[in-house]
Amino acid sequence: IVVHGDAAIAGQGLIYEVVQMANLDGYKTGGTVHIVVNNQIGFTTNYLDGRSSTYCTDVGKVTLSPVLHVNADDVEAVVHACRFALDFRMEFKRDVFIDLLGYRKYGHNEGDEPRFTQPKLYKSISKHKNPRDIYADLLISEDIIDVDYIKSLEKDYKNSLESELEDSRKQDKTVITPFMQKDWLNYKRAKVKLMLDVVDTTYPKKKLEQISKVISTLPKDKNFIRKIKRLVESRKVMFDQDKLDWAMAEHLAFGSLLEEGYDVRISGQDVERGTFSHRHAVIKVEDSEEEILLLNNISDSQGQFYIFNSLLSEYGVVGFDYGYAMASPKTLTVWEAQFGDFSNGAQIMIDQYISSGENKWKTPNGIVMLLPHGYEGQGAEHSSGRMERYLQLCAKNNMFVADCSTPANMFHILRRQLKASYRKPLIVFTPKSLLRHPRVTSKVEDFSDGCFQPLIDDNKANAAKTNTLVFVTGKFYYDLLEAKENLLRDDVALVRIEQLFPLPKKGISKILSKYKNVDDIVWAQEEPRNMGALGHMLLHFEDVKNWRTASRRSYSAPAAGSATRSKLSLIHISEPTRPLEI
């Protein structure tokens, strides 16, 4: 059941997104009853200024859903409409709308004066009988009840209210009962210390090998295009050669969780194949287009793997997946943006629910957001997941924000989401160019025996020789590494911060203590100076001496529209012999 206001259902684009989900496999609910509290006014805006359609419920025509327009003063008609709507929903598993046409007796809130903006309307409302009296008069006129019965009902109801009020005054504090309490009984409320503790995400090598065989074996009795055959078979080769790439990290993370009995749900635009053609979680049979999900073939007792290409929506789909994660703490619920830049279409969900829902309503949530991020010359709308905005929302213990640079770390951070004794939203800035980068591979033992590393030291740097200590995150590390090697700079150490929040402060302090001889400490980022993680890092490096920034200069847009200019900017940042900011 979804309750709307008349102004909102007509004016909010989210409504259209949700209505379009009604019959889609990944999002349908078996029918939704939409109840519109239609008071013919939106705060101070008249309905004639609030929509172009005749009815506020005309959005229901998109799915040919029935709409019941009912007079809110007619109690029996309202009950009849609600019963009919529910019967329709249960019988046909489709949406139905109830347009409950009434009025708002007072202002938008207790202190509001509605006669400022609708004097004529409120003159009529002030003279209008309320629904209780209208219905009472009807029942009395039909000799069904008498006045004494009405007075008795009113007295009992007022006594009940007074009793509840007195009980509430005796309580020292108000306790919020968590939504879906039973599903969340065995989960802890994690503070920062617990969030920084190592979670055991190891997984037996033999089982990893079994999963690799499953995801690299196509049914022999079906035809597939040559490219997909080659791609799927390469997964086993990769495992045997002990060089696992990003796609394998994802598949093995999902497969290992499924084998342990957890469910996995992935949703978003083009997620079945992956925007950058790396995932191929759904394989299409060439002749029939039958869909094959190899991750559902791991074992008879495994969890269920669900993956859905979403409609072209961010706000509605992120909202749906947030709700799904709220109801399913034992499911890895993943929403992936087509490009990280597009997640701003869901900004309301991120601001009001994902970043602050647990703090406001005591409702934990383990949703994962994967945001492809990185500067490869694709322009302002295809380069940045707006890292700075997510980090600005971080406080105390509200969520994880990460920017992984190795497949193994991606494997472990996904497993950590369900292996931890708590649930927190996880924002991961994922790579694009690293998906097939020859240096971006991990060994099988990094998966089977390792754990998530929030901080990765430079294992090739000689601390005694190091003069410049560079902190960096994500994909940009490989650009700096290439520049360091080309320039033969053995006096530079590159340290990767893989988890941006909560920040591994103790680990960073150990790194600073280790490199005692440095006189140049750098935070390096490929984003402009007014974006990226710089603002977040300033809060934590403000007391560090000899600290500076290497970045692109401040821009209004996240990236340049020219690939050539973007590459030149990168060279200026990554080569210390040139200006570190342009």
Where are these regions (language model features)?
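Thiamine diphosphate
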Residues: 1-43, 47-58, 67-93, 244, ...
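Glycine-rich ThDP/TPP pyrophosphate-binding loop and its adjacent helix/strand module
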Residues: 1-169, 341, 376-378, 396-513
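Short acidic (Asp/Glu) and glycine-rich catalytic loops that position anionic groups and cofactors
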Residues: 35-39, 59-66, 109-118, 130-142, ...
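Acidic beta-strand-to-loop metal/phosphate-binding motif
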Residues: 100, 518-527
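Hard-cation-handling environments
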Residues: 131, 142, 147-264
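ASCE RecA-like P-loop NTPase motor cores
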Residues: 220, 257-258, 264, 272, ...
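Single conserved hydrophobic/aromatic residue that forms the stacking wall/gate
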Residues: 571-582
